[in-house]
Amino acid sequence: MFYDQTKVILKAGKGGHGCVSFLRQKYMPNGGPNGGNGGKGGDLRIVADVNVGDLRAFHFNPQWKAKNGEPGRGGDQNGKGGEDCVIKVPPGTVVQLRDSDEIVCELLEPDQEIMLLEGGRGGRGNATFKSSVNQTPRQFTDGDPGQEGDYVFILKTIADIGLVGFPN
């Protein structure tokens, strides 16, 4: 069966949380803050690929999600950024919002790439909050959520042949 229209649920990755940590050494009981920042969430991109014939992959698996960013760690270690999710669709695919039927983008050329959803920013660790006034900050920020949405993929095809009249 040929699938030329399908509904999908897409979600970008969430940013990692910041970390609260303090330097610990043998003869230094009160070390400074060294909590790392969280990693950025993965983006969700769409690529037009000539090797994909129809939208069959999205009919049987309608939910696609990018990876989340990792949280920060002690020792000023920042979290790793989330891996991007790359979705391959055939050229001629139109992406529109499911609720409002607004066309978001069209992928007409082969190897055309569009970033549809952006991943969330990573949170800040306590090392970024230190100052001359506040030398032992115990605050951090959470990572931002990634963008998400419900979309409809529509494949526009052009017929190679046309029949006029009734075929016998």
Question: Where would I find each of the regions flagged by the language model?
Answer:
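Conserved P-loop NTPase architecture
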Residues: 1-167
